Structure formats: structure tokens, C-alpha cells
Swiss-Prot record:
InterPro entries: RBP11-like (IPR036603), RNApol_insert_sf (IPR036643). DNA-dependent RNA polymerase catalyzes the transcription of DNA into RNA using the four ribonucleoside triphosphates as substrates. Keywords: Chloroplast, DNA-directed RNA polymerase, Nucleotidyltransferase, Plastid, Transcription, Transferase. This is DNA-directed RNA polymerase subunit alpha.
């Protein structure tokens, strides 16, 4: 498993945003150019423009040999799942997307996840329309522990109604070596105040699935 160590060197509240310098260590596990390219790409992406706004659960009882699905409220629990439906709903709403086709003029999509097998279901198991790309495809959503039911989950994905401006105002970085000749990066990141530079960086790491995060 790959780990990064992240140290906040300086953090400052500006009149029109936030500024932070932080050091990222333990880069020996990565191709440096690839890591930099991925982080820059995810920091500068419009990660918040598309969101899951509604999650609906449909269940059928496999023991009754019926194909009829019934709506289940997300405040209920199902003993065939390890997680509650409310917890699963929250995990769905953390997923982030990118619009792949600039010619698409709509402002909403629908996606579906069919859960028949007994297994861990990941965000990559969701069936999306071709215009939409999932950015965090390895997130664990829930675990199904019984064949007694089949679960169908319908997702509504919408664009934000308000105009969105990217929170990143400035991004600079350098790669250096310490006294042990280990590579590390210094990030100079300024945001517009809607998100702190450190949280923006963490969100980029989580969306890119490059590493597992831990406290230094």
C-alpha cells in the first residue's frame, strides 16, 4: 500500500481567498511526472459541477420467485446489507464526475447499479451513460451478504443550477531532495475561499485514487 506524508508549512487567510504551502513526502513509489500531471489535472477539474441529487432503492425478494421491485425508503435498514441505506446514500453523494462530451446540452443523467451477487459493490459497478465519466471508481459503496434479495439502485445526476467557478486561483509546485536524497514536493496553492488549499489537495488525491491517506 502506498502512503504519502503531507506537512502544512504555512497557511494564510487572504482578503479574497486562502493561501497554503505544504510539503508532500514519500514520493519514491511514484513516477514523479505522472503524479504531478494527475494532481494538476484533478485540482483544475470542475469536480463539483455534477452531483448525485437523488438515490432511489428498489428491492425484489428472490425467495418468492417474483420479478416485481418495490421502492424502499433510505431510512430503513436491510439485513441483507452490512451498511444502512442512509449510509449508502451518503457514499453515493460523495462521488464525482466529469462530462466527457462538450456537445452534450442536457443538465441531468440517470445511472443504475444492479446488485444480485453477494460481494462488495464498488462505484465502478455503476452503469453510467457514455457522456459521463466517474472520477473515483474504486470507492466501496456497500456489501451484500445474502442472495435473498436483488437490489436495484437508481441515481439521478444533475448539473449545479448556479454558475460554478473553479476554486483554484493559483497552483505552483517544485520537486526537491532532502538530506537523505528522497524526493519531496512543495505545493503553493491559492483558492477562492470556498475551499481551503489543503482540502482541495486532499479532494484531488481522493478523486485520482493515487494513494491512501493517513495523518502524519
Amino acid at each position: 500500500m502506498k502512503y504519502l506524508k503531507i506537512y502544512v508549512l504555512r497557511s494564510r487567510l487572504l482578503k479574497d481567498g486562502n493561501l497554503a504551502f505544504f510539503k508532500v513526502k514519500n514520493l519514491q513509489f511514484f513516477d514523479k511526472n505522472f503524479f504531478v500531471t494527475e494532481i494538476r489535472r484533478y485540482l483544475l477539474l470542475d469536480l463539483e459541477s455534477w452531483n448525485i441529487t437523488n438515490v432511489m432503492f428498489f428491492v425484489t425478494n428472490n425467495l418468492k420467485n417474483t420479478s416485481t421491485f418495490h421502492v424502499v425508503h433510505n431510512f430503513l435498514g436491510l439485513e441483507e446489507l452490512k451498511q444502512s441505506l442512509l449510509e449508502i446514500t451518503k457514499k453515493f453523494k460523495l462521488l464525482r464526475f466529469k462530462l466527457c462530451s462538450k456537445s452534450y446540452q442536457g443538465n441531468k443523467f440517470f445511472a443504475v447499479l444492479n446488485a444480485f451477487e453477494v460481494k462488495d459493490f464498488l462505484s465502478g459497478d455503476i452503469i453510467f451513460p457514455p457522456h459521463l465519466k466517474l472520477l473515483n471508481s474504486r470507492e466501496l459503496l456497500f456489501t451484500k451478504i445474502s442472495f435473498n434479495i436483488t437490489l436495484k439502485i437508481l441515481l439521478k445526476i444533475e448539473a449545479k443550477k448556479a454558475s460554478f467557478q473553479k476554486p483554484i486561483k493559483r497552483l505552483n509546485l517544485i520537486i526537491e531532495k532532502d538530506e537523505f536524497f528522497d524526493n519531496y514536493m512543495i505545493f503553493d496553492l491559492t483558492t477562492d475561499g470556498s475551499v481551503t488549499p489543503f482540502n482541495a489537495f486532499i479532494k484531488a488525491l481522493q478523486s485520482s485514487n493515487l494513494v491512501t491517506l493517513t495523518n502524519a
